UniProtKB/Swiss-Prot annotation:
HAMAP family: Proteasome_A_A. The lineage of its organism: Archaea, Methanobacteriati, Methanobacteriota, Thermococci, Thermococcales. It comes from Thermococcus kodakarensis (strain ATCC BAA-918 / JCM 12380 / KOD1) (Pyrococcus kodakaraensis (strain KOD1)). Its main location: cytoplasm. PANTHER family: PROTEASOME SUBUNIT ALPHA/BETA. This is Proteasome subunit alpha. The gene is psmA. GO terms for cellular component: cytoplasm; proteasome core complex, alpha-subunit complex. It is found in: Cytoplasm. The formation of the proteasomal ATPase PAN-20S proteasome complex, via the docking of the C-termini of PAN into the intersubunit pockets in the alpha-rings, triggers opening of the gate for substrate entry. Interconversion between the open-gate and close-gate conformations leads to a dynamic regulation of the 20S proteasome proteolysis activity. Belongs to the peptidase T1A family.
């Protein structure tokens, strides 16, 4: 008789809690996010920036065809991590809800309303049979009365952040935010911080492997950062990192000299 692990029954059904209060399929969906490409967001007083890792697995893929920041409405965008096919379903649903709200009320949908609708859908996929949780998290950002930045979890939970990261490089990026983010940060510094946090998660950051978009309260329309500007930011960051490494080595040598 084959050995069956004690948690097997709870493992196969998304609607059954384990004895210790967990839904294993939701945990597995979170693991899919942890293995996904890194996405980061940073908010400043007058806007929000999103930056995403583009995992281009073949040199034959056209980089321009591989979008990772999705426009939901003029004033709202989303950056996913996890199973991109699942994320695309959520993005399509968000676009539909945004259109319905605009046609019904004659005004753009508030980001908080849209986030709640998407997370209601995510939560429903943890509660009913015949479906599975979405293996994707979304960073949803935009402006209405103020800039807003939300993280949506596969469980249906959502959180508003000043700066946040999802995906495989979350811990590294969040450490950068904890160290460098400040409440009075401006647009240029916010964009640079987002790129820095993302670059720290990559072995060789390049303009082809990173996508950046931002929105301001003045224009209320998302703009993609041109490649020339992105390369400029990356070069500045790499230069600063090299200078920091040189300073650290000099400090190490000074300590060794003192010990001798």
């Amino acid at each position: 008789m084959a050995f069956v692990p004690p948690q097997a029954g709870y493992d196969r059904a998304i609607t059954v809690f384990s004895p210790d209060g967990r839904l294993f399929q939701v945990n597995y969906a979170r693991e899919a996010v942890k293995r996904g490409a890194t996405a980061v967001g940073v908010k400043w007083k007058d806007g929000v920036v999103l930056a995403v890792e583009k995992r281009i697995t073949s040199k034959l893929i056209e980089p321009s065809s591989y979008e990772k920041i999705f426009l939901i409405d003029d004033h709202i965008a989303a950056a996913p991590s996890g199973i991109i096919a699942d994320a695309r379903v959520l993005v399509d649903r968000a676009r539909l809800e945004a259109q319905i709200y605009r046609l019904t009320y004659g005004e753009p949908v508030p980001l908080t309303v849209l986030v709640k609708k998407i997370c209601d859908l995510k939560q429903a996929h943890t509660q009913y049979g015949g479906v599975r949780p979405f293996g994707a998290a979304l960073l949803m950002a935009g402006v209405n009365e103020k800039p807003e930045l939300f993280e949506t979890d596969p469980s249906g939970a959502y959180f508003e952040w000043k700066a946040v990261a999802i995906g495989s490089g979350r811990n590294t990026a969040m450490a950068i935010f904890e160290e460098h983010y400040r409440d009075d940060i401006g647009k240029d510094d916010a964009i640079k911080l987002a790129i820095l946090a993302l670059a720290k998660t990559l072995e060789e950051p390049t303009a082809e492997g990173i996508e950046v978009a931002y929105i301001t309260m003045d224009e209320k329309r998302w703009k993609k950062l041109p490649r020339e500007e992105l390369e400029k930011y990356i070069n500045e960051i790499l230069q600063e990192v090299k200078e920091e490494e040189v300073e650290e080595k000099q400090e190490d040598y000074s300590e060794l000299d003192q010990n001798y």
